[in-house]
């Protein structure tokens, strides 16, 4: 099994790069995000590799970081997500952004991936929500609040305040973070209107 390749960029295809390693050209399939960050032909590059062996072919997938490769593997544990969809997701969201989106139950962010509809996005978030916090870089309290809202366990004023901010055009992660901060400031029993005011102040900082 090939775990890493280091060589010179030979050429690019629509969804792959040819990496020249000691005179042998390896065709490595990558996300659009990875391809955009690789250097020009003739320059050196290093890719972490995931090797797929089938009866009729051997296929290599390349990643700039081990974390990106790990997300490629995790995504494919979700029903209906294969290598092509996993690469598309990683082409739309950087690994850290994907982790944050899943941890915060932000299905809309995942659904921005071409070819990923609301149902697949929901499965990705639902099936990976317990794994994402380990990779996310958001306040655990915000993750907890977003999960409570998604599971309909959050107090009604909190859920309504987040919904109001989303309706004003803020993203789900921004709204959840702002209302989490507002809830800490206001204390228990705060009404929706107060949370919205405090949340908007937080977003204006």
UniProtKB/Swiss-Prot annotation:
Residues 1-64 are annotated as: Domain I. One of its GO terms (biological process) is DNA repair. InterPro entries: DNA_helicase_Holl-junc_RuvA_I, Hlx-hairpin-Hlx_DNA-bd_motif, NA-bd_OB-fold, RuvA, RuvA_2-like, RuvA_C, RuvA_C_sf. SMART domains: HhH1. Keywords: Cytoplasm, DNA damage, DNA recombination, DNA repair, DNA-binding. GO terms for cellular component: cytoplasm; Holliday junction helicase complex; Holliday junction resolvase complex. Residues 65-143 are annotated as: Domain II. One of its GO terms (molecular function) is four-way junction DNA binding. Its main location: cytoplasm. Pfam families: HHH_5, RuvA_C, RuvA_N. Residues 154-205 are annotated as: Domain III. Disulfide bonds: none annotated. It is found in: Cytoplasm. It comes from the Bacteria. Gene3D superfamilies: 5' to 3' exonuclease, C-terminal subdomain, DNA helicase RuvA subunit, C-terminal domain, Nucleic acid-binding proteins. Residues 144-154 are annotated as: Flexible linker. Belongs to the RuvA family. Has three domains with a flexible linker between the domains II and III and assumes an 'L' shape. Domain III is highly mobile and contacts RuvB. Homotetramer. Forms an RuvA(8)-RuvB(12)-Holliday junction (HJ) complex. HJ DNA is sandwiched between 2 RuvA tetramers; dsDNA enters through RuvA and exits via RuvB. An RuvB hexamer assembles on each DNA strand where it exits the tetramer. Each RuvB hexamer is contacted by two RuvA subunits (via domain III) on 2 adjacent RuvB subunits; this complex drives branch migration. In the full resolvosome a probable DNA-RuvA(4)-RuvB(12)-RuvC(2) complex forms which resolves the HJ. The RuvA-RuvB-RuvC complex processes Holliday junction (HJ) DNA during genetic recombination and DNA repair, while the RuvA-RuvB complex plays an important role in the rescue of blocked DNA replication forks via replication fork reversal (RFR). RuvA specifically binds to HJ cruciform DNA, conferring on it an open structure. The RuvB hexamer acts as an ATP-dependent pump, pulling dsDNA into and through the RuvAB complex. HJ branch migration allows RuvC to scan DNA until it finds its consensus sequence, where it cleaves and resolves the cruciform DNA. This is Holliday junction branch migration complex subunit RuvA. It comes from Bradyrhizobium diazoefficiens (strain JCM 10833 / BCRC 13528 / IAM 13628 / NBRC 14792 / USDA 110).
């Amino acid at each position: 099994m090939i775990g890493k390749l280091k060589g010179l960029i030979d050429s690019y295809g629509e969804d792959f790069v040819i990496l020249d390693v000691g005179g042998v050209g390896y065709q490595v399939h990558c996300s659009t995000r990875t391809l955009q960050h690789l250097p020009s032909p003739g320059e050196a590059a290093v890719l972490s590799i995931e090797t797929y062996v089938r009866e009729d072919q051997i296929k290599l997938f390349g990643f700039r970081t081990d974390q990106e490769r790990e997300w490629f593997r995790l995504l494919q544990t979700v029903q209906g997500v294969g290598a092509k969809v996993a690469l598309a997701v990683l082409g739309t969201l950087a690994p850290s952004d994907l982790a944050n989106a899943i941890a915060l139950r932000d299905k809309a962010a995942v659904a921005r991936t071409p070819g990923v509809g609301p149902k697949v996005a929901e499965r990705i978030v639902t099936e990976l929500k317990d794994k994402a916090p380990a990779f996310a870089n958001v306040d655990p309290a915000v993750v907890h609040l977003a999960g409570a809202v998604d599971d309909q366990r959050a107090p009604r004023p909190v859920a309504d305040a987040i919904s109001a901010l989303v309706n004003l055009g803020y993203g789900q992660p921004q709204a959840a973070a702002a209302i989490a901060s507002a809830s800490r400031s206001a204390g228990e029993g705060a009404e929706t209107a107060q949370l919205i005011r405090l949340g908007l102040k937080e977003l204006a900082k």
